[in-house]
């Protein structure tokens, strides 16, 4: 059942996937559902809802990624980083979170599903000092745009971008973007079977 739904959703957003990638996405949902019972990784309890609210909600960003090296800040159980890594084997993703149980889950997912282009790091974002900066800094349900930019300002490379995944955009939040940052693009995203607003903001440092 989930397999057919995934096929339909991927077709709806025009995102081609191999049989192996589809299997990895479905297996990720299965592991998230299983571990969630013990570790409370997400408030979404139903695998069908996970497919929409977590997998597809992450994958709609995929066509907009520019570069090869990304960090997913406040990734939780690996969202959007793990679905994006599955669909973009040519890119690398660092998954950053301050909670050990989430990092343990991510590492188990990478091991069991054979995902080789992610690395999980347990750290607060302010304390994390990467040896190499990133082409893209991703944030989904992590913080306000103001806080994301304030806490993550040290992470992008010289021509790197911030990718802020937001629901409804408020004028108030947009007005609180700190000085020195510019929104270069605001993209309305359409998630299959999700009747809620979704936006991607691309932001650069001036």
Swiss-Prot record:
Cytoplasm found in the keyword field: yes
MF (Gene Ontology): rRNA (guanine-N7-)-methyltransferase activity
Pfam families to which the protein is assigned, alphabetical: GidB
UniProt-listed InterPro entries: rRNA_ssu_MeTfrase_G, SAM-dependent_MTases_sf
Domain of life: Bacteria
EC number(s) given by UniProt: 2.1.1.170
Keywords linked to the UniProt accession: Cytoplasm, Methyltransferase, rRNA processing, S-adenosyl-L-methionine, Transferase
Residues the record lists as binding S-adenosyl-L-methionine: 74, 79, 125-126, 140
Recorded GO CC terms: cytosol
Coiled coil (UniProt feature): none
Chief location bin: cytoplasm
Localization of this protein: Cytoplasm
Catalytic activity: guanosine(527) in 16S rRNA + S-adenosyl-L-methionine = N(7)-methylguanosine(527) in 16S rRNA + S-adenosyl-L-homocysteine
Function comment: Specifically methylates the N7 position of guanine in position 527 of 16S rRNA.
HAMAP family: 16SrRNA_methyltr_G
Family stated for the protein in its record: Belongs to the methyltransferase superfamily. RNA methyltransferase RsmG family.
Protein name: Ribosomal RNA small subunit methyltransferase G
């Amino acid at each position: 059942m989930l397999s057919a739904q995934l096929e339909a959703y991927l077709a709806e957003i025009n995102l081609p996937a191999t049989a192996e990638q589809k299997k990895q996405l479905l297996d990720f949902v299965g592991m998230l559902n299983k571990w969630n019972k013990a570790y409370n990784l997400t408030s979404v309890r139903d695998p069908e809802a996970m497919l929409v609210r977590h997998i597809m909600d992450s994958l709609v960003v995929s066509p907009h990624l520019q570069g090869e090296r990304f960090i997913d800040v406040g990734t939780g159980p690996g969202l959007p980083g793990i679905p994006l890594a599955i669909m973009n084997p040519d890119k690398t993703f660092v998954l950053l979170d301050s909670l050990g149980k989430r990092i343990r889950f991510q590492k188990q997912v990478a091991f069991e599903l054979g995902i080789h282009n992610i690395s999980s790091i347990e750290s607060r974002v302010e304390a994390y000092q990467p040896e190499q900066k990133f082409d893209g800094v991703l944030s989904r349900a992590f913080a306000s745009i103001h806080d994301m930019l304030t806490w993550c300002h040290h992470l992008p490379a010289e021509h790197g971008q911030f990718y802020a995944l937001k629901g409804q955009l408020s004028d108030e939040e947009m007005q609180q973007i700190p000085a020195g940052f510019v929104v270069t693009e605001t993209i309305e995203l359409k998630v299959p079977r999700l009747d809620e607003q979704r936006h991607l903001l691309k932001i650069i440092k001036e």
